[in-house]
């Protein structure tokens, strides 16, 4: 793994055969990084689309020495491509898998194709609550504010926990 090992968090989502695609993505990712935590996974309605299947969303905690750019473009995007993710024009289109770096240690960065922390953390319940589950005392590296204080109007109301699927994922890494 190298010397500079960093804790990071990956947002995970799928609404095309989510159970098999998320398991497949976890297996592939575990060949590149150490998976150190798996949040509860939730069934959630698709954003801004009514004629799509529900999503399964959650967060993976990892430990890695891979740089953020290499993690995104060399590992996560490659896994998405291998699982036939189509990253075309409609950012709300159905997807086989969506893997996003949410946090990478205490890093704050803004580049053309990568912003850390991910700006959606405080906007999307299906990212914020699983992240808090893994790290309840999380302080956001950019604002220095505790995440729990930034949730505002976010609610778990429309998030349905999938306990059986969550346990099956956790059993994959807790061997």
Name what the model sees in each region.
Residues 47-54, 69-73, 78-175:
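Flexible, gly/pro- and Lys/Arg-enriched active-site loops
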Residues 2-12, 16-95, 105-106:
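Nucleotide and nucleotide-moiety/phosphate-recognizing core
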């Amino acid at each position: 793994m190298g010397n500079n090992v960093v804790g990071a968090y990956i947002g995970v989502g799928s609404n095309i055969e989510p159970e098999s695609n998320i398991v497949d993505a976890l297996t592939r990712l575990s060949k590149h990084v150490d998976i150190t935590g798996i949040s509860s996974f939730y069934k959630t309605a698709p954003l801004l689309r009514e004629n799509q299947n529900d999503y399964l969303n959650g967060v993976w905690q990892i430990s890695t020495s891979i740089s953020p750019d290499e993690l995104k473009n060399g590992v996560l995007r490659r896994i998405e491509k291998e699982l036939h993710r189509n990253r075309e024009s409609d950012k709300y289109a159905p997807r086989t898998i969506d893997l996003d770096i949410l946090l990478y240690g205490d890093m704050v960065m803004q580049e053309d194709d990568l912003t850390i922390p991910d700006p959606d953390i405080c906007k999307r319940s299906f990212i914020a609550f699983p992240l808090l589950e893994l790290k309840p005392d999380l302080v956001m590296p950019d604002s220095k504010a505790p995440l729990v204080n930034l949730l505002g109007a976010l609610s778990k109301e429309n998030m349905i926990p999938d306990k059986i699927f969550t346990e099956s994922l956790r059993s994959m890494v807790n061997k």
